[in-house]
């Protein structure tokens, strides 16, 4: 049997994009930092988002049934940290400039790309909920430098200039 700590150690060596997942609706405005996000299909455009069921905002995502995936750029490390912290929801959204698209879920104005989604299906697997999310709107920036998490620290991926 594989121990959870061994699995987490191995997964720390898998480079992942850093995302802030947000929701807004009858249950309020909430968000969290996530790396467990991936494309499922482009027809219809669908993303998979994983969320720990013990997260204090978990019930709010279930009730609102919408979310946005905000892919962070290198300038967003402080936003990632805020949404991964114990700050209350209102304090988290004091970091960054926010707007909305079709669903009303908060969109980070200068994210690399934001996917505005409706949650179509939810599966429970172990400690996490897996949200299957239909993308209904996309906002893309001009930036091309991504914030990546690898080996328990942030890294930069993208355009570099050699002088």
Residues of each region from the PLM?
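Basic, polyanion-binding surface patches
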Residues: 1-163
């Amino acid at each position: 049997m594989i121990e959870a700590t061994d699995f987490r150690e191995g997964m720390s060596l898998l480079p992942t994009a850093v995302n802030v997942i947000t929701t807004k609706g009858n249950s309020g405005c909430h968000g969290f930092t996530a790396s467990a996000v991936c494309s499922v299909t482009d027809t219809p455009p669908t993303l998979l988002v994983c969320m720990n069921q013990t997260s204090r905002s978990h019930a709010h995502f279930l009730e609102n049934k919408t979310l946005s995936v905000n892919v962070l750029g290198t300038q967003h490390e402080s936003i990632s940290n805020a949404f991964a912290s114990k700050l209350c929801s209102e304090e988290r959204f004091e970091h960054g400039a926010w707007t909305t698209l079709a669903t009303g879920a908060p969109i980070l104005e200068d994210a690399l790309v934001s996917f505005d989604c409706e949650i179509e299906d939810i599966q429970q697997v172990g400690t996490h909920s897996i949200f299957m999310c239909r993308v209904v709107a996309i906002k893309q920036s001009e930036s091309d430098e991504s914030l990546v998490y690898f080996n328990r620290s942030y890294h930069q991926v993208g355009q570099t200039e050699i002088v």
